[in-house]
Amino acid sequence: MSEEKIEVKETDMEDPQRDMVISVVREAQRLYNIDKDVAAFVKEELDKKFGATWHVICGKCFGSRVSYEMGHFILLKCNKVNVMIYKCGY
């Protein structure tokens, strides 16, 4: 099965971290079909890889306004699902 196209809509992450996050999102969507399960998997993996505290929002349509640590934000679309990921808090 070919990988779905990832569309990065907005990010301020460095390339290596961005690439790791995209890899984790792809793995989550391969393993799970429910948005909340995708979000939980991504959050747990990023907390392990990069330290706490990551927040993940998944869905086809949502609005948002968040505060985050500079260099730790990405909004992407994968498999027709929008995924917002950011780090905030300790």
From Swiss-Prot:
Keyword terms of this UniProt record: Cytoplasm, Cytoskeleton, Dynein, Microtubule, Motor protein
Coiled-coil spans in chain? none
Q: Which domain of life is it from?
A: Eukaryota
Please give the Gene Ontology molecular function terms for this protein. dynein intermediate chain binding
Q: Which residues cross the membrane?
A: none
Q: Name one GO biological process term.
A: microtubule-based process
User: Which family, according to UniProt?
Assistant: Belongs to the dynein light chain family.
Its biological function? Acts as one of several non-catalytic accessory components of a dynein complex.
Q: What is this protein called?
A: Probable dynein light chain 2, cytoplasmic
Source organism (scientific name) = Caenorhabditis elegans
